[in-house]
From Swiss-Prot:
InterPro entries (UniProt xref): Enolase, Enolase-like_C_sf, Enolase-like_N, Enolase_C, Enolase_CS, Enolase_N
Keyword Lyase: yes
Keywords: Cytoplasm, Glycolysis, Lyase, Magnesium, Metal-binding, Secreted
Any Pfam family matching the protein: Enolase_C
Gene: eno
HAMAP family per record: Enolase
Positions annotated to bind (2R)-2-phosphoglycerate: Q162, K334, R363, S364, K385
Cofactor: Mg(2+)
UniProt-listed Enzyme Commission number(s): 4.2.1.11
Pathway membership, UniProt: Carbohydrate degradation; glycolysis; pyruvate from D-glyceraldehyde 3-phosphate: step 4/5
Main subcellular location of this protein, as a coarse class: cytoplasm
Record organism: Corynebacterium glutamicum (strain ATCC 13032 / DSM 20300 / JCM 1318 / BCRC 11384 / CCUG 27702 / LMG 3730 / NBRC 12168 / NCIMB 10025 / NRRL B-2784 / 534)
Active site: E204, K334
Name of the protein: Enolase
Family: Belongs to the enolase family.
Length: 425
């Protein structure tokens, strides 16, 4: 296999106008890979460390230190290694960093190189990235979980829940699912305008109308689904990313004007699941409330997907504990939460072996990089969360999945309703 000849990084901008790292890897056979690193707005305290420069430049958010770490230490360490040994390369960078959370070199530096190496190796092998990573069994196209109303830390809409998503579970193909989702998105704009609300957009391309409650937002989406000619629960299901750690303060959940315990929040979710065709609830409780997650999973986990995002942070060790405690039943997969592809692979594999579902995910700060689209297929996630069908940083991932579907031809299978085995709607 071709060896790594040169590793290089630069500072670029993400979709929110903040700096991020872009890494390039060149192999001795002329092959090449480039990758841009995403960044989150609502971040879990257990995530790998994103290295920022501080100071006045870019309001302290520059990444020149991370870029320097790639161009000097990481590049020197990886020169001469075979590019197809992803685990060896990732472990070399982890060892070089020497910290538990990649804080010395920066997870943003390490991840950029990790992804660029995989792309260069795929280029050298003459394979698309999803096939290079996933092998011949990589053939399942994921359900697009489209965030069409943005709230919480992603918008100024006033609603506490961070994301209201649609899942086109009734489609036969990914391309049909994408069309269905886009049609609902446009119908929602019409519904919002008819009610005299703002059609401004949040970080992830979803609308950010000023609504008073979770139910009001869900009602808007149900109306849009029907306006577009689809049946809620049959053609299009609903999903939530609550991001509850964002409104957890002093031991209570400050939700919709009241203060609630974990048990009271569980009742809120149970009522929502009974009232709406909800297939998935992400981060319903604070990120260290293990007991609360276990109780919630026992209460409603048989009929809805309970996803750990800030709760698991794509970390195999936290996931292992969650499996042992029967806390949640699904993992959100964000490559920059853990910082290398290898550790991401390990987390997804562990989840699937335990009967957990997995959802590949973007971050609110994205680039035109499409790696996660390939990873969703390569790792057989069955679900992908990458924003509304709007804004090129989000649509780039959907368009890549259209290309993958075309490449797969008759071998491609759309996950559809099967991605949500617990949903009884």
């Amino acid at each position: 296999m071709a060896e790594i000849m040169h590793v290089f990084a630069r500072e670029i901008l993400d979709s929110r106008g903040n700096p991020t790292v872009e890494a390039e890897v060149f192999l001795d056979d002329g092959s090449h890979g480039v990758a841009g690193v995403p960044s989150g707005a609502s971040t879990g305290v257990h995530e790998a460390h994103e290295l920022r420069d501080g100071g006045d430049r870019y309001l302290g958010k520059g990444v020149l230190k991370a870029v320097e770490n790639v161009n000097e230490e990481i590049g020197d360490e990886l020169a001469g290694l075979e590019a197809d040994d992803q685990r060896l390369i990732d472990e070399a960078m982890i060892k070089l960093d020497g910290t538990a959370n990649k804080s010395r070199l920066g997870a943003n530096a390490i991840l950029g190189v990790s992804m660029a190496v995989a792309k260069a190796a795929a280029d050298s092998a003459g394979l698309p990235l999803f096939r290079y990573i996933g092998g011949p069994n990589a053939h399942v196209l994921p359900v697009p979980m489209m965030n069409i109303i943005n709230g919480g830390a992603h918008a100024d809409s006033g609603v506490d829940v961070q994301e209201f998503m649609i899942a086109p579970i009734g489609a036969e193909t990914f391309s049909e699912a994408l069309r269905n989702g886009a049609e609902v998105y446009h119908a929602l704009k019409s519904v919002i305008k008819e009610k005299g609300l703002s059609t401004g957009l949040g970080d992830e391309g979803g609308f950010a109308p000023s609504v008073g409650s979770t139910r009001e937002a869900l009602d808007l989406i149900v109306e849009a689904i029907e306006k577009a000619g689809f049946t809620p629960g049959k053609d299009i299901a609903l999903a939530l990313d609550v991001a509850s750690s964002e409104f957890f303060k002093d031991g209570t959940y400050h939700f919709e004007g009241g203060q609630h315990s974990a048990a009271e929040m569980a009742n809120v979710y149970a009522e929502l699941v009974d009232a709406y065709p909800i297939v998935s609830i992400e981060d319903p409780l604070q990120e260290d409330d293990w007991e609360g997650y276990t109780n919630l999973t026992a209460t409603i986990g048989d009929k809805v997907q309970i996803v750990g995002d800030d709760f698991f942070v794509t970390n195999p060790e936290r996931l292992k504990e969650g499996i042992a405690k029967k806390a949640a039943n699904s993992i959100l997969v964000k490559v920059n939460q853990i910082g290398t592809l290898t550790e991401t692979f390990d987390a997804v594999d562990m989840a699937h072996r335990a009967g957990y579902t997995s959802m590949m995910s973007h971050r609110s700060g994205e680039t035109e990089d499409t790696t996660i689209a390939d990873l969703a297929v390569a790792l057989n996630c069955g679900q992908i969360k990458t924003g509304a069908p709007a804004r090129s940083d989000r649509v780039a991932k959907y368009n890549q999945l259209l290309r993958i579907e075309q490449l797969l031809g008759d071998a491609g299978v759309y996950a559809g309703r099967s991605a949500f085995p617990r949903f009884q709607g």
